Amino acid sequence: TAALKISETNGKVLRYGENPHQKGFFFGDFDAMFSKLHGKELSYNNLLDVDAAVNLMGEFKNDAPTFAILKHNNACGLAQRETLHQAYIDALAGDPVSAFGGVLISNKEIDKATAEEIHQLFCEVVIAPSYAADALELLKGKKNRIILIQNETEMPEMLVRTCLNGMLLQD
């Protein structure tokens, strides 16, 4: 037996939903999973892409340097190389057009060389476990760019999705 309770009073009001004419809300503990270092408020679409990015990178958490670029919940670039810098370059080469305005995620600390490459691309969100100080300062050069540190947390045990006139739950 499963039970689900959502308290509307704990929802964070977002700028808007998937489209500007829709209302958007987030129910959950974002701050337990991420430390926001810089940038504007996350949007509904940002949150969906961040979720997809975290789920994808979870497959490469303890692997060699890996970089992924996502847009509209889909990976448009993914590479694992000896250096994070090369992983980013190769991930971007996967689909540089779709990468514009996307979410970037790394499984390793972002160094200055990688940050210099990232800084040339318009991206909404950058996620990493940590940032070298000089890399962080460079990435903060775009005032609206959202920079997140992914904290060490467990993903929820249940996947919840709306479906038809109800919900699906899965472990």
Which residues make up each language-model segment?
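Active-site loops and adjacent core secondary-structure elements that bind or stabilize anionic groups
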Residues: 1-138, 142-171
